[in-house]
Curated annotation (Swiss-Prot):
Source lineage: Bacteria, Bacillati, Bacillota, Bacilli, Lactobacillales
Pfam families (alphabetical): RadC, UPF0758_N
S-S bridge residues: none
Motif JAMM motif, residue range(s) on this chain: 174-187
Protein known as: UPF0758 protein SPy_1118/M5005_Spy0840
Amino acid sequence: MYSIKCDDNKAMPRERLMRLGAESLSNQELLAILLRTGNKEKHVLELSSYLLSHLDSLADFKKMSLQELQHLAGIGKVKAIEIKAMIELVSRILATDKTLTDSVLTSVQVAEKMMAALGDKKQEHLVVLYLDNQNRIIEEKTIFIGTVRRSLAEPREILYYACKNMATSLIVIHNHPSGNIEPSSNDYCFTEKIKRSCEDLGIICLDHIIVSYKDYYSFREKSTLF
């Protein structure tokens, strides 16, 4: 469980933030500022402690649905919505901070960006980065969002945008909602197929990366396909 310390002698979080800066506040205090008020049973600091004590880590916030958050904290719909909005805003800030504006250098560089973007998705997403001859991103394209009837994508869909963008190379990324990053037999077949199709058109498939919310698998780093 997430460890919480509650010190009743501390000044209220807003005053501490003004005096010491946001970086000096605990997670409990920062959450209390977002909650603003407690409920009938708990003071706002107690309520934030209660919520955090039910999490293994702060990353669990992102995986919780609006209904789960509202039920767990007993904070009502409005506060739950505000927390979810804050989480999404933070995710977008992090994604922007990790945007690959220059050259793509390593698989881990791509994986970190896509773990933040796709790690918490409940459905399988397939994203392709199309690169120029200096490994700069021309376009980041979501090719499909998976359903029970369909898994991954056909090479023609991926190559259509490669030709449209006059891409020299590409990187394929998809997530495993289960959290297990080990590639399936279908993942291997798909990787071989897209790599072969790229070669037929003179386009380089640099990597196929599988991501979860906390880890990744790179076919270039760990398989013999590249």
